[in-house]
Amino acid sequence: DECASAWAQGGIAAVLDPQDSVDAHVNDTMIAGAGINNLQAVREILSQAPAAIAWLLEQGVEFDRLEDGQTLHLTREGGHSHRRIAHVKDRTGLAVHQALLHACRARANIRMHESHAAVDLLHAHASSANTCFGAWVREPDGRVTPWLAGHTVLATGGLGQLFSRSTNPWTATGDGIAMAARAGCAVQDMEFVQFHPTALQINGQAAGLITEALRGEGAWLKLPNGERFMPRHDERAELAPRDIVSRAIHAEMQR
């Protein structure tokens, strides 16, 4: 469970309220991305979000519901103009992570190899294109062996641990990105590393994330003297996107 997915708290954004729209969701996302997002990709992903929530429900994710027991409870997070965040209390990522692990283990056609680590891709440089046919894998006994595959998918998370201070888990070391780059794949937008704006550290322990949904429900960010500071950094105040909130917090700490 030491991965960013399991750490995620707030929820998953999808247009599930009749008063909301995919166009509004797309607009919010493009603004939060400073307009450099791929509009086609944004629209395609967000259009499929409601179906993705329905599929997660089928896999056993128990999203919070209203008192009627049917309607999903939706909260709001930074950068969103509507309530569209489906959630499982304040541990949505862990709930999704565990439900999908359970679903994978229940399928006879999926084999899971724990305590193994891919260390590099098996690939051949051809005149027309690079060809990947698997990966070098470190076995539990330390041996590195070739695993052949007709199709190889890299889904290994980010590289937040490149920074000395990070709200990413210790596993976010960029191994998959490095393997892809060494194999000749193009990497893009590597400068965009997310720092969660709010965390709590007690007595030197590892900092725990404070869910963004708190700000979505009206919580304010204040300085040690009790002064609220976000309104002077952005008109959306605590509901500004994460990058703006993170920079504002850093700026206040440097004053």
For the regions a language model picked out, list residue spans one by one.
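Glycine-rich FAD pyrophosphate-binding loop
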Residues: 1-12, 18-19
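Rossmann-like flavin
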Residues: 32-73
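Conserved redox-cofactor binding core of oxidoreductases
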Residues: 57-143, 155, 199-201
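Short hydrophobic core segments
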Residues: 146-157, 180, 226
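An anion/pyrophosphate-binding glycine-rich loop and adjacent beta-alpha core
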Residues: 179, 185-255
